[in-house]
A protein has these predicted regions:
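Extended, charged/polar low-complexity intrinsically disordered regions
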Residues: 1, 9-110, 114
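Helical mechanochemical/support elements of P-loop NTPase systems and associated helical scaffolds
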Residues: 111, 115, 139-142
Length: 154
């Protein structure tokens, strides 16, 4: 079972690297401003995806029940309801389809991931969150980026 997941993650990682290289070549060319912004946002999210795959491989994640997998912000298509479900840890919600605009995306770090987990756990408990810290450290941008990810105006 472990070998299957390891091979699967390695295969995905190889495909992902190829796709990322193609996007980087595309953004180096001549593009309109809006197209460049979209591609750069896609590259930012793809680099995070690559890092997640690397982490899953290095942690020898044994299946979808592992915390290394459940702590990631994930999107699932529900055929029965024809909706997109968003999951992270114990939090589950439907995609809200709130278009925020063609904006850049935040570079997701381990601290950003922890903030996402904390804020979504608060939402699950019908509470709210107020990130705290020094000025200019990305508290507002992290909250706004989570809103963009789940398509919910915050």
């Amino acid at each position: 079972f472990f070998f299957f997941f390891f091979f699967f993650f390695f295969f995905l990682f190889s495909l992902h690297q190829n796709s990322l290289s193609q996007l980087i070549q595309l953004v180096r060319g001549k593009l309109e401003k809006a197209s460049r912004r979209k591609i750069i946002a896609t590259i930012t999210l793809d680099v995070h995806g690559r890092d997640v795959l690397k982490g899953l491989i290095s942690e020898k994640t044994e299946g979808p029940e592992a915390f290394a997998w459940s702590r990631q912000l994930r999107f699932y298509w529900a055929k029965e309801t024809r909706d997109i479900q968003i999951r992270i840890c114990d939090y589950r919600t439907l995609y809200s389809y709130e278009y925020i605009g063609n904006t850049g995306r935040l570079v997701i770090t381990p601290l950003t991931d922890r903030c996402y987990i904390t804020l979504t756990t608060a939402l699950r408990l019908m509470l709210s969150g107020a990130p705290a810290g020094p000025a200019g450290t990305g508290k507002t941008e992290t909250t706004k980026d989570l809103g963009r990810a789940i398509a919910l105006c915050v």
